Amino acid sequence: IPPPTLKNDMRRLINNEELSDVTFIVDDKPVYASRIHLAARSEHFRALLFGGMKESVSGNVKIQISDVPYPVFVKIIEFLYTDNVTDIAPDIAVPLLMAAERYLLGRLKGLCEDSIRKSITCDNVISLYLASHRHRATGLKEICLDFIIDNLDTVEKSRGFHVLKDQSQICQWKLLWREYQNGKFQTAKFT
């Protein structure tokens, strides 16, 4: 029996102009896709492409995307075609997480959280925690809190900790640490 080829076949369709019927313009660059495939994989794209909006007309459609950077949007298309993403670079992980939230792609959001978890440092954990809070990335928020608890002495001395504009957040972290040390830690207070 020959090995399965579906994933590789789908990967060859990513950004394939010849087999596309929708073109997204992102940062003045085209991203080619198949409307039926996007609609099958995403409620957001189904509504956009077949929900009665001007984008839902037949023929090759062009859609301007102005709020997602090109490398992030290409990763979204890769995910929609393959149910996975290769090599989430640290510089696009948080924007990709935000886009996954916007486009209602729960699995992609989880993949981003996992990728970010692997790159957390004492210098970036505070900004990642704040981003997770803004974008309702509960899994990432818990990962950040665990990292902060395990490394609070170092995190507290980091540049990331001291750039917080709201001093009450610094006090919250100190109280969190004291409660943790005294066995009274409750995550819900800080999420």
Residue ranges and their predicted role:
Residues 2, 8-121:
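Canonical BTB/POZ domain core
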Residues 7-14, 46, 50, 74-77, ...:
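Generic detector of well-ordered alpha-helical segments enriched in charged/polar residues
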